[in-house]
Amino acid sequence: MDFRLLNEKSQIFVHAEPYAVSDYVNQYVGTHSIRLPKGGRPAGRLHHRIFGGLDLCRISYGGSVRVISPGLETCYHLQIILKGHCLWRDHGQEHYFAPGELLLLNPDDQADLTYSEDCEKFIVKLPSVVLDRACSENNWHKPREGIRFAARHNLQQLDGFINLLGLVCDEAEHTKSMPRVQEHYAGIIASKLLEMLGSNVSREIFSKGNPSFERVVQFIEENLKRNISLERLAELAMMSPRSLYNLFEKHAGTTPKNYIRNRKLESIRACLNDPSANVRSITEIALDYGFLHLGRFAENYRSAFGELPSDTLRQCKKEVA
């Protein structure tokens, strides 16, 4: 499959030692370990971009490398086979993924993958909060246990999806999009996956025409840097605090407190990824959004996005340089 998904502008490694590629992937894309073949000298290649909270990665190890991951914790992996094949093993199951097929890993899925010598993949890392937000914005119901997808899919299930990824890659490499624009693209990708691939999400529209929920969400968006009390939200929704909890559980799949915290974290991440935001320090932006305990803020951020806020800011400055 010959698709232009990230070009030399996003090149991190070429003809590189596989362990160097693996170390970089561990930092930005997903925790794993690799096992190399006994013979030969594989030469890895890697392209990488961060865009709208997503990590976009094109990778080849250049040899028959085995990749083992204990799980992604707070992120999903969409892995599209571009060249060669990849053997996937899971609880007694085996499948050789070929070009045109894709593997979707849930946060708690362990992975045991063996690349062919000519295997090349395009990987999209989606933080769970991006999919959660897509559920909320589309008025779909997220299960209490979290969103889960089936593992094996074909690109034919996602009509036009590869072209969408090409557009996103082009946007990431050639323009300095505003954070809101980047979030919009990320939301389209998440919505497309939820709509077209098998998952446990109910797409029955729950909150259509629910002015109370829409009014509360709008208030939260307009006051992310302020201390938002549950009492004020209940007053806006014209209901009791207990009914407010039920409202958020029904329409957002989480509590009001978690929803507010996640939106604050997403807004901070957008600023850290925006070169024009001129972020002077992590401490300053955390305090701006009401996170007074910096250690807890960093841990919440890492749980949501799989990296520390300092990692996000460092990567943004690296791309600008």
UniProtKB/Swiss-Prot annotation:
Residues within the DNA-binding region(s): 231-252, 282-305
GO biological process: catabolic process; positive regulation of metabolic process
GO molecular function term, any single one: sequence-specific DNA binding
InterPro entries: AraC-bd_2 (IPR035418), AraC_XylS_family_regulators (IPR050204), Homeodomain-like_sf (IPR009057), HTH-like (IPR037923), HTH_AraC (IPR018060), HTH_AraC-typ_CS (IPR018062)
Domain of life: Bacteria
Protein's cellular compartments: Cytoplasm
Main location as per UniProt: cytoplasm
Cellular component, GO annotation: cytoplasm
Coiled-coil stretches: none
SUPFAM superfamilies reported for this sequence: Homeodomain-like (SSF46689), Regulatory protein AraC (SSF51215)
Keywords attached to this entry: Activator, Aromatic hydrocarbons catabolism, Cytoplasm, DNA-binding, Plasmid, Transcription, Transcription regulation
Entry annotated with the keyword Magnesium: no
Disulfide bond entries: none
Domain HTH araC/xylS-type stretches: 214-315
TM spans (from-to): none
Role of this protein: Regulatory protein of the TOL plasmid xyl operons. XylS activates the xylXYZLTEGFJQKIH operon required for the degradation of toluene, m-xylene and p-xylene.
PANTHER family (UniProt xref): ARAC SUBFAMILY, HTH-TYPE TRANSCRIPTIONAL ACTIVATOR RHAS-RELATED
This protein's name: XylDLEGF operon transcriptional activator 1
Native source organism of the sequence: Pseudomonas putida
Name of the coding gene: xylS1
